[in-house]
Design a protein with these regions (language model features):
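Helix-biased detector of long, well-ordered alpha-helical tracts
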Residues: 1-338
Length: 338
């Protein structure tokens, strides 16, 4: 694609061209949500900042756009909502041209299509401090969810949709390769990236099953709570403890890991269990499932792992070691007594 600067064509024309290469129509005005009568509107939003949430040295723009959408629709799936629309605001720095922003937009549109989103709107804003990405996703929860959702109880199961810790290890590998490049000026071969491509992929392009809400409905399972575990399992446990008023027990030997997580952890001097607890960016959905639905859930959702259960309030939030010791969980942003 011919290099084009925004100063040459203007914002309005740039947005028109971006929509021209997307599956969405450019529309003005507010979004209209369609669904069953009595459905509840849910929104999820997230702001991504260059240098804080991503590094363009090694983050492909198309993957970045895809990941930003997944990060917001994941919050909707956690609340049992089906996404319908996204609103995108891009703060564009002077170093990015239109073809680069088109790559980013292509990733956004690819994720939106994959997650059955029917409407997208876009605005471009100048940025002095690097690329900024703001996405608001809106969806609907069916009336049956609010009508039939039961309160959580002690012994209810804590279930997660896939492996954890891999994204933090993948990011750490990329950072290590970046330091090599800055020191030597050459990344020829990059054997570590190829060897640990599943971990790197977990960070650069996390995926979520777009049909998870429908599959839960088909199995007649309504979780009492749902979370996107994007800031580590410890943070998720703290939120669940706060929201439910019940204790949370996670079992370290039940946490699912990517095959070579421990090999990579040894190389990086990072404990994969610590990465799972406090690393973040895994974008796994955690549901609290009634223990009465154990057999159905195990049969119908075999990609999920049961990593713990709710407990009496006085338990607080703990991780149970293979030896049976209960260790209190600590999470960034939470006071020690929370």
């Amino acid at each position: 694609m011919e290099k084009k600067n925004f100063s040459d064509i203007g914002k309005v024309e740039a947005i028109r061209q971006l929509f021209e290469v997307s599956p969405f129509k450019q529309k003005d005005g507010t979004a209209f949500l369609s669904g069953e009568k009595g459905g509840i509107v849910r929104t999820a939003s997230r702001l991504w900042l260059e240098g804080i949430d991503f590094d363009l040295t090694y983050f492909p723009l198309k993957h970045l756009g895809y990941k930003c959408v997944v990060g917001t629709v994941g919050e909707l799936y956690a609340s049992l909502a089906r996404p319908q629309s996204i609103s995108v605001r891009l703060g564009i720095s002077a170093k990015l041209d239109l073809p680069q922003v088109t790559e980013l937009w292509n990733g956004i549109c690819a994720a939106a299509e994959e997650h059955h989103i029917s409407r997208a709107d876009l605005d471009l804003i100048p940025s002095r401090n690097g690329l900024t990405i703001s996405i608001v996703s809106t969806g609907l929860t069916s009336p049956e969810v609010s009508e039939n959702r039961k309160s959580a109880n002690s012994k209810d199961l804590i279930c997660i949709s896939g492996n954890v810790g891999g994204a933090f290890l993948g990011m750490s590998l990329l950072e290590a390769e970046k330091r090599k490049f800055e020191k030597a000026g050459d990344l020829t071969g990059t054997p570590d990236i190829e060897k640990y491509k599943m971990l790197v992929g977990a960070y650069l392009k996390p995926e979520i099953n777009p049909d998870i809400v429908s599959e839960l409905s088909d199995s007649d399972i309504i979780p009492s709570y749902g979370y996107l575990a994007d800031r580590g399992l410890a943070d998720m446990a703290k939120r669940l403890n706060r929201d439910s008023g019940l204790g949370v027990k996670l079992y370290s030997n039940q946490i699912p890991f990517e095959g070579n997580s421990f090999e990579a952890g040894k190389k990086l001097n990072i404990d994969p269990v610590a990465a799972a607890m406090n690393g973040g960016d895994d974008f796994r959905i955690v549901y609290v499932v009634p223990i009465s639905k154990y057999e159905t859930f195990r049969h119908d959702f075999q990609t999920f792992s049961i990593i713990g259960h709710l407990a009496k309030p006085e338990v607080g939030t703990v991780v149970v070691t293979p030896e049976g010791a209960e260790l209190p969980l600590h999470a960034q942003g939470w006071k020690e007594n929370e």
